Structures are given as structure tokens and as C-alpha cells.
Amino acid sequence: AGMDTISYVLAMEEISKVDASVSVCMSVNNSLVCYGLQEYGTEEQKQKYLVPLAQGKKDGNLYIGAFMLSEPEAGSDATSQRTTAEDKGDHYLLNGTKNWITNGGSASVYLVMAQTDASKGSKGINCLIVEKDWPGVVVAAKENKMGIRGSDTHTVMFNDVKVPKANRIGEDGFGFKFAMKTLAGGRIGIASQALGIASGAYELALAYSK
């Protein structure tokens, strides 16, 4: 708390030297979820979600977040979202599937990008704060990855999940801009992780060569 980006980069590098799984979990929670809420969330959202996310715990239990943009047919092309959030007045009705979600099973809170008005293109996307234990949220089995296996990656499905309007981040239609701005910061975490992994591998190889 209270430290700058350089301090965060140094911490990410050191953790990545010994455990890339821990660092990628940390990167998503801090670079994407916490940063997004800190910069664009309301005071109510910050108090309810950001405080325990920054602490990593709530009521003595693990409390981290996940960022949900990728879908079966929408990866780099974020405007091709198929997940929908139908405006129902005081809440949204969320339906869709998100793939390759880091912290998908271990997270308690999700930042979910969803299309609320397809006719508006990128301006019809919103970001919603969704709690994992809400009715209609289904977490699929953990992906059997080749590496960074300590980091859980899942497909997550939403079936008529009621999301309060108070859980939308920013004004209506801000979701795409939110995702792009947040991901820009997230890339700092990924770059730091890559440097740390490379440094750790070098140190191990050097020690072995002797």
C-alpha cells in the first residue's frame, strides 16, 4: 500500500523468479482487478470490493479477483463479445461464457465485460462486478495446462445472473474503454513476470553450470 509502479514491478520480478503461478495470480488481482476498481470504481464499490481485494482476504478467507474478457469467439477482438447483460431497470441479467480465466476458481469477485447494446459496437459494452457465489454462476473444471499449473484457469458460465446496477463500473457504455485502459496497466505485470522468470532460469542455469 502506498508504493509506486516501480516497487510493484520489482516485487513481481522477485516473486516470478521462484513461482510464476503465484505471480500471475498476483498480477491479475493487482494489475487488472484492483487497479480497475481503484481508478474507475465508485466509493461504494471500493469499500465493498477493493479493500478486501487489496488485503487478499475477507473474514479470514482468501479473497482475490478475476478479469473476464476472453470468450470462445472473442479474444483479441474485444468488441466481438457474445456475453450479454440485458437491462432490467434496477439490474442487468447476465448470460454468456468466458474462457481462459486466470483465478477463475479461486477468485471471489469477477470483473465481467458484457454486451448491453450490440447496435452500439464498442460503446455498447459494460463492465460488471459479479460475485462468484451468486445464483447462475457456474465454474467449469480447471484447465489441464502445460505450465504455470499452480495458477487455476477456468471457463466460467453465467446463466441469468442478476447483477445490480450499482455494480456497473463507470457510465453506461464505458466497458470497452475500461478493458483497454486496465489491460494497458496489466501488461506491466506480465512484462515484470517475464523478466523474473528469465532471471530465475538464468540463476538456476548458472548455478548448475558450476
Protein language model features and the residues they cover:
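Internal helix-loop-helix
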Residues: A1-N61, T102-V109, K120-G121, I188
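Short Ser/Thr-interspersed hydrophobic loop/turn segments at strand-loop and sheet-helix junctions
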Residues: M12-S16, M113-A114, V130-P135, N159-V163
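Short beta-alpha junctions and helix-cap segments that line functional grooves
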Residues: Y49, Q81, T97-N99, A140-N144
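A short, Trp-centered hydrophobic/proline-enriched beta-strand micro-motif
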Residues: G60-S70
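Short Gly/Pro-enriched turn/cap motifs at secondary-structure boundaries
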Residues: E73-S76, W100-N103, D117-S119, K145-D152
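A structural signal for short hydrophobic beta-strand segments in well-ordered beta-sheet cores
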Residues: T83-E86
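A short core secondary-structure module
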Residues: H91, N95-V139
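Glycine-rich beta->alpha junctions and the first turn(s) of the following alpha-helix
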Residues: T116, V137-K210
